[in-house]
């Protein structure tokens, strides 16, 4: 989670990424199933959090075992990245050019990870977002704005 938990009316709420690390598929399902929207009318701009390309900074040994995978959140971040890649591929198949994913490259040395909801992490994510916006090809982006 990139964001700290928040208490509202005595209930504790966590970052929604704990439920849907790539909510694109959930959004499309909700639009189709509950709102009756024809998928041919859907355009989706998906904004990532730089984890789709996650790889452990030091790599992982073939015989690392549970300790190697569980240290530094490697297993969790790998599972998040794989889910995001899977959902992105499905959305590209279903929506084609009507789907655009904006995401930064995972900065291995940037001190980002699970439960690192620090001011430094927020600054890093903001800087990654700014760079992504600067570098995006504006032509396909226009249909989403």
Give, region by region, the residue ranges found by the protein language model.
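Conserved catalytic cores and adjacent C-terminal regulatory segments
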Residues: 1-145
């Amino acid at each position: 989670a990139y964001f700290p938990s928040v208490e509202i009316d005595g209930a504790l709420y966590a970052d929604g990424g704990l439920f849907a690390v790539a909510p694109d598929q959930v959004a499309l399902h909700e639009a189709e199933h509950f709102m009756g929207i024809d998928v041919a009318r859907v355009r989706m701009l998906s904004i990532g959090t730089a984890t789709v390309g996650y790889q452990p900074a030091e790599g992982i040994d073939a015989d690392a075992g549970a300790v190697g995978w569980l240290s530094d959140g490697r297993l969790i971040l790998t599972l998040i990245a794989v889910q995001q890649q899977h959902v992105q591929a499905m959305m590209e198949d279903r929506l084609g050019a009507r789907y655009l994913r904006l995401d930064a490259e995972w900065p291995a040395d940037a001190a980002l990870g699970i439960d690192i909801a620090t001011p430094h992490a927020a600054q890093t994510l903001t800087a990654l977002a700014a760079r992504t916006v600067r570098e995006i090809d504006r032509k396909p982006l226009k249909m989403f704005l």
